[in-house]
Amino acid sequence: MTRLGTLFTTICALVSIASAASAQAPTPPDQLLPAGTGEAVQPVMDRMIFVHGILDQFEGRTDGRTPDFRWSGEGWIGTDYDKFWVKTEGFRRSNGTVDDGQHEFLYDRAITTYFDVQAGLRSDLDSRRTRNWAALGFEGLAPLFWHVQGTGYARDSGHFAARFEASYDFLLTNTLILQPQFEVNLYSKSDPARLIGAGISEIDTGLRLRYELDRKFGPYIGVAYEGKFGQTASLVRRVGESTSAVRFVFGIRTWF
């Protein structure tokens, strides 16, 4: 009985010591009161949900004979770390057809301060045969703050594709920006229904001079080059279309 009493007394003493230590534990940092205020400091709100959208290219293109319309935009909703992206781009040609219509739905995860990894689906939806792809890629700011993105794609029957894009904003003044832009597409197999050949299929590049009326809206002018190569060029020639063109462009860029 004496041993049981001693054990009980020891347990009670340990519980008392633990309770006292808990009562004297330091206040968590996010509950500390700044000197001279009556409000607690709030933790960093890195889990707030934001919405962002940008129409990077909304432009007419012309070589003096055949005007085309080009769009390229994207938007996302999410936190600093996790986002859902929608991207869309394409051409409406002077004959009323739509081509190069690519629409992507991606989950985005930040992996470093400047780069995100993205995965999801791409749908080629325009006047030609519809194709659907699985997508995996990256997007971010490279050294010297070039905006770059590269994506690999895969679909049925062993078809693979890749796309790389890069652009940069040179601030000539606070409101006048010169933007070079480059995009290249590659495919592992030919797809005649979409006038796509294996290898490097097309390059779209341009130089645009933008005047920002404010940071969210700016009209621009410039020059753009579209080129089809290799087997893609052969397929395009068969239907009587041009394999390359240099065009004057004019449009607007806006974001929210």
Predicted regions located by residue number:
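Transmembrane beta-barrel strands of outer-membrane/channel proteins
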Residues: 57, 86-90, 119-123, 150-154, ...
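Outer-membrane beta-barrel initiation region
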Residues: 23-95, 101, 108-109, 248
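Detector for outer-membrane/organellar transmembrane beta-barrel domains
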Residues: 130-192
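Residue-level signature of outer-membrane beta-barrel architecture
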Residues: 77-79, 109, 140, 154, ...
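Outer-membrane beta-barrel "beta-signal"
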Residues: 207-212, 242-256
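Repeated loop/turn-to-beta-strand initiation elements of outer-membrane beta-barrel proteins
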Residues: 81-86, 113-117, 144-148, 173-178, ...
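Residues that define the transmembrane beta-barrel architecture of outer-membrane proteins
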Residues: 49-51, 67-71, 99-103, 130-134, ...
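Membrane-embedded beta-strands of outer-membrane beta-barrel proteins
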Residues: 73, 105, 136, 164-166, ...
